[in-house]
Amino acid sequence: MSAQPISDFHAYPDAAGHFGKFGGRFVAETLIAPLQELSAAYDLARQDPAFIAEYDKDLKHYVGRPSPIYHAERLSREVGGAQILLKREDLNHTGAHKINNTIGQALLASRMGKTRIIAETGAGQHGVASATVAARLGLECVVYMGATDIERQKINVYRMQLLGAKVIPVTSGSATLKDALNEAMRDWVSNVQDTFYIIGTVAGPDPYPRMVRDFNAIVGREARAQMLEDYGRLPDAISACVGGGSNAIGLFHAFLNDPGVKIYGAEAAGDGIASGRHAASIAAGRPGVLHGNRTYVICDDDGQIIETHSVSAGLDYPGVGPEHAFLSDSGRAVYQGITDDEALAAFHLLAHTEGILAALESSHAVAQSIKLAREMPKDALVLCNLSGRGDKDVHTIAAREGMVL
């Protein structure tokens, strides 16, 4: 916990990219100049009315924003307790929140004169969103993806290829998201003159955590305005899944200075925290440096990263965005572990009661929202970020339940 209460959470990060003791820029000398170039370009763009107007236009006419808030009435009745509301990011073009960020970064890449974009992906949604905007803007696109994730997300791999992207399997380490990010960083160092690296989450060295947050903050700004317009008040609690944490910080940011709104993040507890097979960096990690920033990481006593596990490829990451680490330490947000089984149960319950197939990532937040709702009065409001749709996960769920499709 922080020694003194924080009056303005929107004042972070500081000029050096720090969220309290987290964040920063811990990278090899070869990346300092590219990061400085990127930071300067972003700081100019974010203050340019023409850039903002182009971004807003694409969000409306290409992505399909605003995404609605849906009252899950039958789910709420089934669960008992508070009313569960869903922020429907699954209805965006490409089926998740990821395109909010890739649109912004791709426009910035074009503004900087870059002709090639690279990306890492876990569940494949960020890869699809990157390939999508690359096709629209006429940019070459290369996506790095762990071989393990390629096996469990074959549909998204083919979607990327249909969009013209080259998907490169990564077989090092655990062959998942962290390894894909490592390979993408290596590519960027070697090809920085013409290449822009679109990181998909609020991790990495500064300016990535704040830049990805800013491009996703539309989620929370919309949600806050929609709550006031449709319900006449703010929600009592908000919930989102947290791997790196881009969808979560996108929702959380607009509510950080609203003390009456409780904030909850759902981490991937996998087979249970005690089992050691999980990806709950805040619940079971310790401070360390990963992918260029200081945050909570899952590591051994020697500081070596431990292999993580989650049924959800998008949450299978041994770190968390530095702003989430900061929000946890400050006490502003509470992060809880949701197991694979709890997420799958929530997936099925939402499908049966509301006719919505949520992504496995999002199903962790649905499970958390169900737990919260059960402990709250009937007139309370819980807003859950439904960050993506579950079409991509149907084969994974079927295989886990013994079905061959």
From Swiss-Prot:
GO CC annotations on file: cytoplasm
The answer on whether this UniProt entry bears the keyword Amino-acid biosynthesis reads yes
State which Enzyme Commission number(s) the record gives. 4.2.1.20
Query: Which residues lie in coiled coils?
Result: none
* Keywords per UniProt: Amino-acid biosynthesis, Aromatic amino acid biosynthesis, Lyase, Pyridoxal phosphate, Tryptophan biosynthesis
- Mark the residues carrying the PTM N6-(pyridoxal phosphate)lysine: K98
Q: Which reaction does it catalyse?
A: (1S,2R)-1-C-(indol-3-yl)glycerol 3-phosphate + L-serine = D-glyceraldehyde 3-phosphate + L-tryptophan + H2O
**Pathway as given in its UniProt record:** Amino-acid biosynthesis; L-tryptophan biosynthesis; L-tryptophan from chorismate: step 5/5
Gene Ontology MF, one = tryptophan synthase activity
- Name any one Pfam family assigned in the record: PALP
Question: Tell me, what does this protein do in biology?
Answer: The beta subunit is responsible for the synthesis of L-tryptophan from indole and L-serine.
Q: How does the annotation summarize its subunit structure? A: Tetramer of two alpha and two beta chains.
Under which name does UniProt file this protein?
Tryptophan synthase beta chain
Species of origin: Xanthomonas campestris pv. campestris (strain ATCC 33913 / DSM 3586 / NCPPB 528 / LMG 568 / P 25)
Gene name per UniProt: trpB
